[in-house]
Swiss-Prot record:
Cytoplasmic side: 1-8
Gene3D superfamilies recorded: Nucleic acid-binding proteins (2.40.50.140)
Family: Belongs to the CcmE/CycJ family.
GO cellular component, one term: plasma membrane
Gene of this entry: ccmE
Domain of life: Bacteria
Name the record gives this protein: Cytochrome c-type biogenesis protein CcmE
GO terms assigned for molecular function: heme binding; metal ion binding
Entries under Pfam families matching the protein: CcmE
Keywords, sorted A to Z: Cell inner membrane, Cell membrane, Cytochrome c-type biogenesis, Heme, Iron, Membrane, Metal-binding, Signal-anchor, Transmembrane, Transmembrane helix
Subcellular location: Cell inner membrane
Keyword Membrane: yes
Ranges facing Periplasmic side: 30-128
Topology in the lipid bilayer: Single-pass type II membrane protein
C-alpha cells in the first residue's frame, strides 16, 4: 500500500510539473507576439535608447513630410503629446485621427520609430 501511494504521488507531481512547464512555455511565446504599448503620457518613465512601443491617435494637422520617405507627426492620448519621426513606407490606414502604434526608441524627447502599425476597428475593409 505504501509503494502504491508513493507511485501515485510521484505521478501527480510529474503531471503538475509538466503542466506548469507547458503553460510557462506558451505564456513566454505569447508575450513575444502580443503587441503591448505605452501611451505618450507614460514614456517619460522609460530610459532613453530602450526599445518600446508607443500608441495613440495621430493629432490633426501634425503630419509633416521631411523628405521623400521621412515623416514627422504627433500622437496623443489626450493627456500628453509625443513627436514621432519615421523613415519608410507608411501603413495604408495612416491618417489624422487614426490609432497608431510606433515601435522604436526615445531619443532627446523625440520618438524615433523603426516600424508603424495602424490600428483599425472591427469593421476593417482594405483600401481599394
Amino acid at each position: 500500500m505504501q509503494k502504491r501511494v508513493r507511485n501515485r504521488l510521484i505521478t501527480i507531481i510529474i503531471c503538475f510539473c509538466s503542466a506548469f512547464l507547458g503553460i510557462s512555455i506558451i505564456l513566454y511565446n505569447l508575450e513575444k507576439n502580443i503587441v503591448f504599448f505605452l501611451p505618450p503620457s507614460k514614456i517619460n518613465e522609460i530610459e532613453q535608447g530602450k526599445e518600446l512601443r508607443v500608441g495613440g491617435l495621430v493629432k490633426t494637422d501634425s503630419i509633416n513630410k521631411i523628405a521623400d520617405d521621412k515623416i514627422s507627426f504627433v500622437i496623443t492620448d489626450n493627456i500628453k503629446d509625443c513627436e514621432i519621426l519615421y523613415q519608410g513606407a507608411l501603413p495604408a490606414l495612416f491618417r489624422k485621427g487614426q490609432g497608431i502604434i510606433a515601435i522604436g526608441q526615445l531619443s532627446n524627447g523625440k520618438f524615433i520609430a523603426r516600424q508603424l502599425l495602424a490600428k483599425h476597428d472591427e469593421n476593417y475593409r482594405p483600401p481599394q
